[in-house]
Design a protein with these regions (language model features):
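Catalytic-core segments of nucleotide cyclases and related cyclic-nucleotide turnover enzymes
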Residues: 1-8
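Non-catalytic, surface-exposed connector residues within folded enzymatic/regulatory domains
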Residues: 19-22, 70
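Basic/polar phosphate-binding segments, predominantly the helix-turn-helix DNA-binding elements
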Residues: 42-71, 94-119
């Protein structure tokens, strides 16, 4: 009976640990999305009280990507949505995503999607017609 109780306690501890890890994952990834324009790994670790190493591993284990690659992917996805769903200028979209200048946004967007933001918007509008 004592062995069963210890086993049950261990299982409950493992369960709560896993739940806690999943919550950490969710909170960190949500924070990145909400602060995509300015977020840094240092800021995340300070905000949650986690070490840089823990934050980095959490992001990598959850997304399969390092922080910078994940941030870039999120920025591009958000840029795609803004290009399709708003009439905001490419310059204002670039700034809202935290790019220092429009040229950098255009270059990275083209590298990731194969077309410029303007081409992407135009093609998306044609596909909707």
């Amino acid at each position: 009976a004592d062995t069963m109780r210890r086993f049950q306690d261990t299982m409950e501890s493992s369960y709560f640990f896993m739940q806690s890890r999943q919550l950490d994952d969710f909170l960190v990834l949500n924070y990145i999305q909400e602060h995509i324009d300015t977020v840094t790994l240092t800021e995340i670790s300070k905000h949650f009280g986690f070490s840089l190493s823990y934050c980095s591993k959490l992001i990598k284990n959850t997304t399969g990507m390092g922080f910078n690659d994940w941030k870039k992917a999120l920025r591009i996805r958000k840029g795609e949505r803004l290009l399709v769903n708003t009439t905001d200028t490419i310059s204002s979209i670039s700034l809202s995503l935290g790019y220092e200048n429009t040229e950098t946004f255009i270059r990275i967007f083209k590298k990731e999607t194969g077309m410029t933001p303007g081409q992407y918007r135009k093609q998306s509008q044609q596909n909707l017609q």
